[in-house]
């Protein structure tokens, strides 16, 4: 199956493993909840049904926090959807507090630990050119 869009997640390289997994899950929930990317439910041989997942592959990159802020600035000028996760969200425990915490910072002052992007392949690839794949 060929897609004209691409999904990429960028994680700050100094995060603990549990943080990387947590941030990736939250960022993908934002993309999956607002974009038409979810496939059909899965059925095993016993006909047990499981929830559907993204139809598209998801590519994970790593970066410094500073470079992530530069990426966000550029991404805001392109036709891509963006989801973010900031350092402060590790200390909040619900959506209302999460949104309030993000609202305390100007865009260029966000303490980014993760960014999720979805858009046309060529735009997303250009934005992430030179970013290392996560290891």
Which residues fall in each region the model found?
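Positively charged, small/polar-rich N-terminal and surface patches that mediate targeting and assembly
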Residues: 1-135
